[in-house]
Regions:
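Glycine-rich phosphate-binding loop plus the immediately following alpha-helix
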Residues: 118-159
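A short acidic Gly-Thr/Ser loop motif
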Residues: 13-17, 68-69, 106-110, 132
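Short glycine-aspartate micro-motif
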Residues: 7-13, 63-65, 99-105
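Adenine-nucleotide phosphate-binding core of ATP-dependent small-molecule kinases
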Residues: 171-191
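Short glycine-rich, Thr/Ser-proximal phosphate-binding strand/loop in the N-terminal lobe
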Residues: 6-44, 48, 121, 126
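Short, well-ordered amphipathic alpha-helical segments that serve as non-catalytic structural scaffolds
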Residues: 42-56, 93
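Short beta-strand scaffold segments in enzyme catalytic cores
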Residues: 19-24, 110-116
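Short beta-strand-loop/turn "lid" adjacent to the catalytic site in phosphate-handling enzymes
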Residues: 28, 35-38, 53-87, 114-123
Length: 191
């Protein structure tokens, strides 16, 4: 690597439902970040995000790194370093939010938790996508809103209903009859 060239770090996260990019300057300040759903068009979505970044920054020299559940294959095809997702999140939090005790990361189809106190301990759900981003999207769609709308509705809840907590399919099966019985969006969003 040329010592006189200014390099920027490009982080690429290829998830099960979205592509995320972050461009950092040499002082590790974020100068561009964005994400989009890829709808199974990962390469096109990534190309679009990179074009947006280039339009904002102009031509620059980058050092890319890839993470995410869908990133390993792309990493090997492009000969770009791959960092396991939980390692990338833990590393970023230690740099940007060193006071963090516990971090929860909801992916499209998985959920991860990282404990920092007393050493780093990482855990991941392994049973079902219940409680993940895809599940939240499904519930938002069922209630004819988006994820932010669920938060808005939940602020005004009046009742809590028993909903399956371990499986997204069972939770959806619990929610549909509640909708049919007239449960409010506010109450269902709180679940």
């Amino acid at each position: 690597m040329d010592q006189t060239t200014t390099y920027y770090t490009l982080g690429i996260d290829i998830g099960s439902t979205t592509v995320k990019v972050a461009l950092l300057d040499q002082d590790l300040h974020i100068i561009f970040s964005d994400y989009e759903r890829h709808y199974a068009n990962i390469q096109e979505t990534l190309a679009g995000l990179l074009k947006k970044a280039l339009n904002q920054t102009g031509p620059i020299d980058i050092i890319p790194v890839i993470t995410g559940s869908g990133g390993l294959t792309l990493s090997s095809h492009l000969h770009v370093p791959f960092v396991q997702e939980v390692v990338a999140v833990a590393s970023a939090l230690q740099d940007y939010a060193p006071q963090t005790d516990v971090a929860i990361e909801l992916g499209g189809e998985d959920a991860k938790i990282i404990y920092f106190t007393g050493g780093i301990d990482q855990r991941m759900n392994g049973i079902c996508a219940g409680g993940t981003g895809s599940f939240i999207d499904q519930m938002a769609s069922l209630l004819q809103t988006d994820a932010a709308g669920l938060n808005t509705y939940a602020k005004d809840y009046k009742a809590i209903y028993p909903i399956a907590a371990r499986c997204g399919v069972f939770a959806k099966s619990d929610i549909q009859p509640l909708i049919n019985d007239g449960a409010t969006r506010e109450d269902l969003a709180r679940q």
